[in-house]
Amino acid sequence: MAKMRAVDAAMYVLEKEGITTAFGVPGAAINPFYSAMRKHGGIRHILARHVEGASHMAEGYTRATAGNIGVCLGTSGPAGTDMITALYSASADSIPILCITGQAPRARLHKEDFQAVDIEAIAKPVSKMAVTVREAALVPRVLQQAFHLMRSGRPGPVLVDLPFDVQVAEIEFDPDMYEPLPVYKPAASRMQIEKAVEMLIQAERPVIVAGGGVINADAAALLQQFAELTSVPVIPTLMGWGCIPDDHELMAGMVGLQTAHRYGNATLLASDMVFGIGNRFANRHTGSVEKYTEGRKIVHIDIEPTQIGRVLCPDLGIVSDAKAALTLLVEVAQEMQKAGRLPCRKEWVADCQQRKRTLLRKTHFDNVPVKPQRVYEEMNKAFGRDVCYVTTIGLSQIAAAQMLHVFKDRHWINCGQAGPLGWTIPAALGVCAADPKRNVVAISGDFDFQFLIEELAVGAQFNIPYIHVLVNNAYLGLIRQSQRAFDMDYCVQLAFENINSSEVNGYGVDHVKVAEGLGCKAIRVFKPEDIAPAFEQAKALMAQYRVPVVVEVILERVTNISMGSELDNVMEFEDIADNAADAPTETCFMHYE
């Protein structure tokens, strides 16, 4: 059997597991791993400017394409702790990423050695496995188990910590004998699925709630097929958005307290059954459980056993991978269709479509400074059907979810449960690295943009082009809006007179100068009529220079975005739409190509 360093064996494992890209920042304690990566070849390395940035790039890489696993590399100590936010974000959204850290030699682990920290203990609560490998011969097997765990059951992240002496130790390993472990996914039984479909048939006004598990399982096509067979409207969650095109007749809108459509909430409240697949009934989707479940039967299908009953007690709970369940659901529905047992739901579908045509929010404003709604309207016009949006949190994200349109799975890339500021730039770079031909447009408010702004240099250095729409109100907008309940506007202002950039008109940071200083291109817009030309200019600059292009739109300082405490108590702070001119890019008024 061949003898080699443990890190050289690790390279063979990564190759056999399909890894071709890694994001990271080298350091003394991880240098042996980097030496093996250089020697082995086959892995493209993208150098981040911050290890947290690298870990969010790995998230974006995984989320972009089915089957991907993003890899993040860092040294000991602070590099590992910098990865914790991404591990939390990935764990919360069931996203597999592999974080590999260097560590002090084993003999120094408990002697307060330089940058020696118990990263295993720190990372365990936010990962499926976190382990410091103390025996060199175990390195390939620990990595094998890591890939098995990341892919099996509810997907999630893993951290593998490698002490310096473990990395360089010589072990016996035969690469030709290595095989990835079989992946385990729980699957619904035929009896369970037949019961679920029978309950669906009995309902008069059912809706399917499709969550991120449908996207993670690469089951969007099956979801749409099942909905079409049964004529049941679909309500995607924020993480499931794109599983059915926004302009599909059965797309009933999103539901919730913030990232929701008026017509979506109205349809849910009019329903008598919720058929949940791959969703977790998050509180910002449901509001109070009492209101959400009132008068409705609930079916819940999820890959994670402990999700069934965690938030609400369903009438039928099934533990299953979404793809396995939907495969059987389609099969059973087809059999019932042939037997003439599927009810006609034309009236219910027509009611949903009517709400979709009439319960709209106004987006067309000509105000100066610009209202954010107009920005999203212009984005709908400019970027077309194939656009892939990347965003994280804040009023910019909430308004985007209310007003943009998504037509394909994995074309709304959003960290859902964790919502860390700074996520958008590195995640967008990770998406582009996974699929360089994808039409990626990122959306940030000014605070999210500033958190990890240095990662724009990565896009410039490695020629990773995308468009970043920056909506700037010089405020922590979502926090300002939530502070209204406390009758304050406290510690949330980002505006100041910039002594070096009078042209920003008191909005503080000159994002154009910063972006250009990092090697990117940037455009600033003050008037609504200049937004569309700026987007066209951005496309041309991106094609010419192959770098990120920032389009900053200076907004009015204060805009309150629709949100509320219950599904039937969402406050509309702006005018609602009365006609097509008020909301010209809604799918009922505009054809998307």
From Swiss-Prot:
It comes from the Bacteria. Its cofactor is Mg(2+); thiamine diphosphate. InterPro entries: DHS-like_NAD/FAD-binding_dom, Gcl_TPP-bd, Glyox_carbo_lig, THDP-binding, Thiamin_PyroP_enz_cen_dom, Thiamin_PyroP_enz_TPP-bd_dom, TPP_enz, TPP_enzyme_TPP-bd. Its EC number is 4.1.1.47. GO terms for biological process: glycolate catabolic process; glyoxylate catabolic process; isoleucine biosynthetic process; L-valine biosynthetic process. It catalyses: 2 glyoxylate + H(+) = 2-hydroxy-3-oxopropanoate + CO2. One of its GO terms (cellular component) is acetolactate synthase complex. Pathway: Organic acid metabolism; glycolate degradation; 3-phospho-D-glycerate from glycolate: step 2/4. GO terms for molecular function: FAD binding; flavin adenine dinucleotide binding; identical protein binding; magnesium ion binding; tartronate-semialdehyde synthase activity; thiamine pyrophosphate binding. Keywords: Lyase, Magnesium, Thiamine pyrophosphate. Binds 1 Mg(2+) ion per subunit. Binds 1 thiamine pyrophosphate per subunit. Homotetramer. Belongs to the TPP enzyme family. This is Glyoxylate carboligase. It comes from Escherichia coli (strain K12). The lineage of its organism: Bacteria, Pseudomonadati, Pseudomonadota, Gammaproteobacteria, Enterobacterales. The gene is gcl.
